[in-house]
From Swiss-Prot:
Coiled coil: none annotated. Its EC number is 5.4.3.6, 4.3.1.23. InterPro entries: Aromatic_Lyase, Fumarase/histidase_N, L-Aspartase-like, Phe/His_NH3-lyase_AS, Tyr_aminomutase. Homotetramer; dimer of dimers. The modification 2,3-didehydroalanine (Ser) is found at S141. It comes from Chondromyces crocatus. This is Tyrosine 2,3-aminomutase.
Amino acid sequence: MKITGSNLSIYDVADVCMKRATVELDPSQLERVAVAHERTQAWGEAQHPIYGVNTGFGELVPVMIPRQHKRELQENLIRSHAAGGGEPFADDVVRAIMLARLNCLMKGYSGASVETVKLLAEFINRGIHPVIPQQGSLGASGDLSPLSHIALALIGEGTVSFKGQVRKTGDVLREEGLKPLELGFKGGLTLINGTSAMTGAACVALGRAYHLFRLALLATADFVQCLGGSTGPFEERGHLPKNHSGQVIVAREIRKLLAGSQLTSDHQDLMKEMVARSGVGNDVVDTGVYLQDAYTLRAVPQILGPVLDTLDFARKLIEEELNSTNDNPLIFDVPEQTFHGANFHGQYVAMACDYLNIAVTEIGVLAERQLNRLVDPNINGKLPPFLASAHSGLLCGFEGGQYLATSIASENLDLAAPSSIKSLPSNGSNQDVVSMGTTSARKSLRLCENVGTIVSTLIAACNQAGHILGNERFSPPIRELHGELSRSVPLYQDDSPIFELFQTVRAFVGGDGFRAHLVTHLDLAATTASS
């Protein structure tokens, strides 16, 4: 994958993170990087006042630093700001963070050295992953703390995850024949003053969110058939006047997934049955025919449509940030001068992740309510209470499974609260309004994990209902899904420890084979979600 600074998508990030794709640096952009670096070093030697080149940092900006302290200044910055806490990011997220930082530096406005970008690329290609604690970023001035842990590794200090082991960075670099960086003017600040931690984490979360969206479409088509729902609410003619592309797409995809089902009902048939039962006389007659289903069956395009459109909006903001210069100060060729500003501020990513978190939470809200309708004996049609295959009462069936989904759905309501408006001042009130973007991105990752559990629990319940109703009556895509899943998840009929069943289904829906199943049966070409 060629890194130019301008053309990465969240799916490129996924290739580097999950498929361990390697990167190469665009030669023309390397020339630009070299020019900006040379200019930065020349200005530093000439003692031109430039923030972070020959001044203190943050509120200490009035302090001029003589050029003989250039390396000490940058190393002090990195060591003092490698102050993260909590559990470390997973290796795939670390790869995304490094890729985001590399792409930013390759734009050539930061003053980074060619050696810096080459070593960062080597870390990605060789699978050398700095250990980055998740806590510690305010999201402005960028992600100082998490990125300092990357910078620490690049100068040969700290620890890295390498080939499944956490080791001292210096030992790994010696084994791999790599030389630690020697930092010149702005060499440390260039690495840490930006939004790359929140952006990398957001890219990973957004990719997972799109998978959850597709999963929710499939689960809904399964759920509608389990309860004999009507296909009428998914007819295209009813959605075009609403004017929202996401809603039209969701209705279209569910129509396709329902085609060929023997379990769904047709609206015209429902009307005929209602007339037949009422006798069309003068008496008030309760026909027992529901022309309209409950919202979990009927309003899915109006619920998941906004989710898709919100994900697409968040993707626009996150990918623009991914391909941006989010550093300070910036180094320009023409005219030869610097720009002192605040491109490190993470408000775009913070707000994008807040929107993303609401959208992902809504997927979970819908799935949990669908699960409730599927197991509730008062509203689940002819299915047994809590999907117990026999002897309901003696057997509990999916009673405990609902508790899992409902408890997580409640937890998600707290996680979905916005972080981007929860600013607290710091750094001697220099950083007096911050984005908390990394906090929001971390919540995005957690929400995707949580909602994945809810949706996979719903799919497990639908699979159980499929065993009860007869899989041969479902539409071909769902019949295929049940067939694949049933190889490892048979009819649940003995109240064995149900968490094992849920773990099996969770692993199944997150696997490559299931992702291929989604691609086969879902055509999202009309939206950026399909890229």
